[in-house]
Amino acid sequence: MKSCCGENAISDIESSAGLLMTISLAKSFSFAIAVLVPKAEVVFDRLKKDIVPHFSSSYVFLYFIVICRLRFMIFDQGGCAGMIGMVSLPNSYKSVSVQVKWLYSA
């Protein structure tokens, strides 16, 4: 987790300053997750509707689930954080900003 998120990841989450994680899903594009509001309850609807259809697989959806679950195990949070996902599409070079919602009980 430290290699992904930096040395100050825990203090950033506790102070609600935010946590930025960049995940390289493939050579053609990258995915950035900004954790904004710890312990906020959200639902995964707009991610599936706005982001996943742009790709031939559900890798983006799966990465969100894995990162969120790992965050609960490591930082012992009671609810999923509010997130903003930005995807750089490889062909159009446009950034898509989406509010990610997911209801999760740790």
UniProtKB/Swiss-Prot annotation:
Chief localization: membrane
Taxonomic path: Eukaryota, Fungi, Dikarya, Ascomycota, Saccharomycotina
Keyword Transmembrane helix on entry: yes
Subcellular localization, as worded in the UniProt entry: Membrane
Note: Partially overlaps GLE2.
Membrane-related topology note: Multi-pass membrane protein
Keywords: Membrane, Transmembrane, Transmembrane helix
Keyword hit for Transmembrane: yes
Protein name from the UniProt record: Putative uncharacterized membrane protein YER107W-A
A GO cellular component entry from the record: membrane
Transmembrane parts of this sequence: 17-37, 55-75
